[in-house]
Amino acid sequence: MVNLGLSRVDDAVAAKHPGLGEYAACQSHAFMKGVFTFVTGTGMAFGLQMFIQRKFPYPLQWSLLVAVVAGSVVSYGVTRVESEKCNNLWLFLETGQLPKDRSTDQRS
């Protein structure tokens, strides 16, 4: 058994997919970047609202709600982009080729 983060993976699976450790590390980094973005984005949004609240007073609960929602949206975006990079890395490690452009835009 091979330890992969908190879970254990069979040796046969780890041998079949040699890039599994790199992919797991990439995903872990992507999720931690998302958590950091959530904390930072929420703090920045809350600080900005405290600055704006001097001119346009409104209840604190709305400041917290808007800050958390803004932090969540930005964090989701960052995590999605970073996870897509990890997916591309996984495809490259498995096939040896860069993934094709999967956009639906048909311009040539």
From Swiss-Prot:
Its membrane topology: Multi-pass membrane protein
Q: Which InterPro entries match?
A: Tmem141, Tmem141_sf
Give the UniProt subcellular location, in the record's own words. Membrane
Membrane-crossing ranges are 32-52, 58-78
Q: Output the superkingdom of the source species.
A: Eukaryota
Cited Gene3D superfamilies: Tmem141 protein family
Cellular component GO terms held in the UniProt record = membrane; mitochondrion
User: Mind telling me which Pfam families this protein's record contains?
Assistant: TMEM141
Q: Which UniProt keywords apply?
A: Membrane, Transmembrane, Transmembrane helix
Query: Disulfide connectivity?
Result: none
Would you identify the family this protein belongs to, as annotated? Belongs to the TMEM141 family.
Q: What is this protein called?
A: Transmembrane protein 141
User: Whose protein is this, by species?
Assistant: Homo sapiens
Q: Which gene encodes it?
A: TMEM141
